[in-house]
Amino acid sequence: MEQGSERQDERPPLPCANGCGFFGSADTRGLCSKCYRQTVMSQASAPSAAAQSAEHDQVVLPAPEGVPVDEGAMPPPPPRHGAKTKSRCAACGRSVGLMGFECRCGAVFCGAHRYSDRHDCGYDYRGAGRDAIARANPVVRPDKVEKL
């Protein structure tokens, strides 16, 4: 048993099936690694392109007038506090870089203005807390007792 003389294949390497000049392998259907990767990517992108075109063809119909529309299904867009770029504080204009703090009102602030009492925050913390408590603890009412 000679371990050194035993090899996987004694056949000479075959050139790439696309003719790019590199050697192909039987595992990659006779293609080199670069050509194989390109064919796999093109095959993978073709179905996704068809799926995207199918998504764009769908038409959204408005709800009939007699049917009530659930307002909670589509949340309103968050109000902007004037922060057009995330790299500047909305209150003082200082460059915040990577340390910007995003408030619940949607603006980005520096370390000095990150708290709601330090900037003119339009977010209703009290109302949000009230809603969270109402959602977490629904009102439990007992059945009415019939009087005799």
Swiss-Prot record:
Zn fingers (AN1-type): where? Answer: 83-129
The stretches annotated as zinc fingers (A20-type) lie at: 10-44
Q: Name one GO molecular function term.
A: DNA binding
Q: Which Pfam families match?
A: zf-A20, zf-AN1
Amino-acid positions noted as binding Zn(2+) 1 in the UniProt annotation, renumbered to this chain: C16, C20, C32, C35
Would you say which domain of life the source belongs to?
Answer: Eukaryota
What segment(s) does the record annotate as region Disordered? Answer: 64-86
InterPro entries, from UniProt? Answer: AN1-like_Znf (IPR035896), AN1_A20_ZnFinger (IPR050652), Znf_A20 (IPR002653), Znf_AN1 (IPR000058)
The intrachain disulfides are none
What the protein does? May be involved in environmental stress response.
This protein is called what? Zinc finger A20 and AN1 domain-containing stress-associated protein 2
Write down the species. Oryza sativa subsp. japonica (Rice)
Q: What is the lineage of its organism?
A: Eukaryota, Viridiplantae, Streptophyta, Embryophyta, Tracheophyta
